[in-house]
């Protein structure tokens, strides 16, 4: 995971998502959060374009044709304090692949890729096995936040390790250029550059 620059909400977001969403909530004040009307999907295509079809958590490009685009509510809809208030707010949305959204579920990881305080090099990659770990140069408190984020988002699961290792191998085997890697796998790209590979 690497920091992501938050994009400004689309001009029609208020009319397409926020207003109808909040009106629906007013009409259904006691509904279970899992049943909230998914007006956020009306901004999914624009969100994908604004974030270059790159998952906020895995930092990989994925094409919409696979049907894996999803909107994650960083603060989950089920949050007892802010869930309802943020359910239809652009600032609470993270563009991510569906699989990662399902892994996160209702967890709130300590590190948010949209947070300007998240450090660019929070995580390092061991390309021998594709594993990730906190940058050892940071203090114990920040490193623990990194570990807790890895756990909350399951960023070091076998599939993720395999993916990172595969992306690196394609670059190492000269099957893709550094520019291709930057576009398709920004986190792997960042680590290739940092490690001088």
Label each residue range with its predicted role.
Residues 1-48, 60-67, 83-94, 98-197:
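Extended charged
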Residues 51:
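Short acidic/polar micro-motifs at solvent-exposed secondary-structure junctions
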Residues 54, 70, 96:
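The −1 position to Zn-ligating cysteines in a subset of zinc-ribbon hairpins
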Residues 57:
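Glycine-rich phosphate/pyrophosphate-binding loop shared by adenosine-nucleotide-utilizing enzymes
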Residues 71-78:
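Histidine-centered catalytic micro-motifs used for acid/base chemistry in nuclease
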